[in-house]
Amino acid sequence: MKKYLLVVQIFISLNVWAQQTRWQLSNSTSIRWNAEEGLPYSDHIEMSGKFISAVVRYSVNADQSLIVQRDLVWPMLRTIPNNTHASLIRSFTIDVVKMISVNKRLIQKEFVKGITLNGKLIVESTLNDNLRLVRTLFPSTDLPLFGEEYELTNTGTKEITVEIPNVSILSNTKAGDGVEGSYAIAIKTYNAGAVTIQPQESIKFYLSFSGTKEGQDFSSVVMADELNKRNGLLSQLSQNLILETPDEILNRMFAFAKIRAAESIFQTKGGPMHGPGGLSYYAAIWANDQAEYINPFFPFLGYHYGIESALNAYQHFARFMNDEYNPIPSSIIAEGVDIWNGAGDRGDAAMIAYGAARFALSQGDRKIGEELWPLIQWCLEFNKRKLNQFGVVASDSDELEGRFPSGKANLCTSSLYYDALCSSEYLGKALGKDPQLLLEYKKRAAELKKSIENYFGATIMGFNTYRYYEGNDKLRAWICIPLTVNIFDRKQGTIDALFSPDLWTNDGLASQSGDKTFWDRSTLYALRGVFTAGDTKRGLLYLRHYSNRRLLGEHVPYPVEAFPEGNQRHLSAESGLYCRIFTEGLFGLRPTGLNSFTLTPQLPAEWDFMMLKKVHGFQQEFDLTVLRKGSNIQLTVKSGASIVFNKVIRNGSTQTITFRN
């Protein structure tokens, strides 16, 4: 019966996919929507720089007119009370196009023809038969400024005179509302004035929105340079950690996810802090989003600012180590000056140890490894002290912070602690730590693996899988997490449960069977775990479904946080989790030393190749190539001109790769 239901679910999903593609792949870096189809339509996207983040809400009405609302966040313009959500936020709906005169007459109508996304929001319109407009909306990379470029092109045979308004609007916030007093918010046009556009020629003008503290002035900024800097960042990200597979949708979704994963880092007075975003979470770090989800990914991307932010996050958490082994706070907020621990101990020490050990190994820097070792040790000892009588880790809650029940001990925390013990054994060996201590970590991991099976292993709703906590009798999305840490005792029943109609929805996994709530993070973990466990057939099927919906569906182009909470915000760390489906799932990359790792490539049956180019890590840049060779695969690891590994192996077998430094 379960197999029958799975076949029905797959059939339904295939039909749904065919109905949900609004967007199309465009050139090698973008997606495009033809705005003459499927009207009206509206969506929102978040874009970020070091000093600003923007949630842009755009709508195209039935008559092809455009409405744009920019919800702008200045994370370092702190408001009172200076809590998690205290970034200065303002919304703007100004439409400068409606202020333009063409041949002495105001524009009567704008017709949107298409919208392109490529790390920028580009809107193509016509203003009359002979005047084309291309808007490009983007955040500044390193200023507290949001920019818009307007390019007007005369497509006719006669010259056109346009008058572009000189907009200069300044407002000041109430001094008593700001941590540093009053803040100035400015809206300004550049290249304004009357200009004649000859046939087949173009002119450009710009609009900016800035937020500043006293003494700051960006009125003389060159907006074309700001756009070039944004393009430079996007180019840098596109040229590192490049995924190539026969499935262009997966390749493109991976490329987009790199953008969102990397752009949301804010230069706070407490150092660079990767922030989730979503109009709520900035200039702060969390043990799950940063320490666990995104930080272990940054070494492979080779994005130095991301690596700097990861190290900074662990350094901040290390400030809260204590001799009494009281919990490290879940979040360090307000540029590092305050904390949040409103959900108690969420298993945060397990999250931190898991991420810090993987990050230190992958970065391959002995100095960083030594610096993070005391934090990792402290977190491991904290978890050891939290073991209950059944040998699993007790905690007050989990990363969902009470939104769903998690009991007194949950599956996530113990699984993360298990992986942290495994990684710490590798790291300790690389750093030359006490062999007896490392033997103890290995012993603890083996005992914990047994305890996870004995305590959490259960038949839930007919599936041979896991209960999430004692007393849990409904399937939960997080039953996937043992698969991601190479615990495969119940992989068949767990994968069957994940892809059953009890859990799988058109938006991925429901948080709990029978509930409409979904959080992408658990779906992203699940897809990684399914590939890690070797079920490439179902893994690829559902990965395609998910990627097609997120990249080309109604709400694009990134993974999201959740629904209904937050209305599918483009939180940043989820994009890092998407990329980890490939690095750790399909390619099975697991760091085992400062210059070594294992690969367990899982080439899907319908693919003849898959590649990751310009992978960073272990103080190297290298390429991974997997080619089908009959019933086997050929795995090649190349670093520069050197072939590090080149063998024909069994698909799904594990190989050890060592760089000779």
Give the location of each predicted region.
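Terminal accessory carbohydrate-recognition/targeting modules of carbohydrate-active enzymes
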Residues: A18-R252, G302, D535-G539, S547, ...
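Proline-centered turn/helix-capping motifs that create local helix->coil transitions or kinks
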Residues: I265-T268, M321-N326, K384-A394, N454-M461, ...
